[in-house]
C-alpha cells in the first residue's frame, strides 16, 4: 500500500511526517515570526492584512475564527475594529478565537498582548475543536500552505461556518507577470534565507518558507479547491501584482 505524501518545501514527505516538520520550523521562528513576514514581504504584509481586515469589517457580537493566527497580528486588528464599532453604536463583545497548531506561536502572541475579545487555543486546522455552524467568519493568513491536507482544512472551515458565514484567506501566491515573478524569485531564494540566517540564525527555516510558497497552488487553482469544499461566490483579490492574494468565499 502506497503511503500518502505531502509537500514540505520542495521535498515530498510522508503525510504523517509533515505536521511535525512544520511544527519544528515554527518552534524555531516563533519569536521572530512577525519580523519574518516583514522580511518576506518587504513590510508590505501589514497593508495586505489591513485590506483583509477592512474586507471582513468585523462587527460587535460576531464570532471570528483566526486560524493559524499564532502571534495575534490579525486578531488584534479585528478586536480594535469591533471595539470601535461598539463605541459608535453599542452591541455585545465579539469573540475572536485564535486556533494555531503551534504552542510556541501562541506563546509568542500572548507575550505581545491580547484583548478581552481574544481567546487562544492549540488546535489543528484539519480537525477544529468546534461545533458545526459555529462562526460568522473564518480567516487564515499565511497559514494554509503549511497544512498537510489543504482540502481537509477547507472542508473544516466550511463545516464550522454558519449559513451566510465568510471565509477569507491571505496567502503568498503567484505574481501575475513574468518580470515580477523573476524578480520575486530572485529576492526570495537569494535574499530571504540569508536574512533568516542574519536575523534569526536559522537559514533552513526560511528556506522552507520560501519553498512552501512556490509549492502552493496558484490563485485559480486554490479558488477551485475552495469551490470543491463547498464555498460559493469565490473571489480573488491580488495584492502587489499577485505576490499575495486574498481569496473570499461564502458558506451559502
Curated annotation (Swiss-Prot):
InterPro entries: SAM-dependent_MTases_sf, UbiE/COQ5_MeTrFase, UbiE/COQ5_MeTrFase_CS. GO terms for molecular function: 2-methoxy-6-polyprenyl-1,4-benzoquinol methyltransferase activity; demethylmenaquinone methyltransferase activity. It catalyses: a 2-demethylmenaquinol + S-adenosyl-L-methionine = a menaquinol + S-adenosyl-L-homocysteine + H(+); a 2-methoxy-6-(all-trans-polyprenyl)benzene-1,4-diol + S-adenosyl-L-methionine = a 5-methoxy-2-methyl-3-(all-trans-polyprenyl)benzene-1,4-diol + S-adenosyl-L-homocysteine + H(+). Keywords: Menaquinone biosynthesis, Methyltransferase, S-adenosyl-L-methionine, Transferase, Ubiquinone biosynthesis. Pathway: Quinol/quinone metabolism; menaquinone biosynthesis; menaquinol from 1,4-dihydroxy-2-naphthoate: step 2/2; Cofactor biosynthesis; ubiquinone biosynthesis. PROSITE patterns: SAM_MT_UBIE (PS51608), UBIE_1 (PS01183), UBIE_2 (PS01184). It is an enzyme of class 2 (transferase). The keyword Zinc does not apply. The keyword Chloroplast does not apply. GO terms for biological process: aerobic respiration; menaquinone biosynthetic process; methylation. S-adenosyl-L-methionine binds at residues 71, 100, 124-125, 141. It holds the Pfam family Ubie_methyltran. Its EC number is 2.1.1.163, 2.1.1.201. Methyltransferase required for the conversion of demethylmenaquinol (DMKH2) to menaquinol (MKH2) and the conversion of 2-polyprenyl-6-methoxy-1,4-benzoquinol (DDMQH2) to 2-polyprenyl-3-methyl-6-methoxy-1,4-benzoquinol (DMQH2). Belongs to the class I-like SAM-binding methyltransferase superfamily. MenG/UbiE family. This is Ubiquinone/menaquinone biosynthesis C-methyltransferase UbiE. It comes from Caulobacter sp. (strain K31).
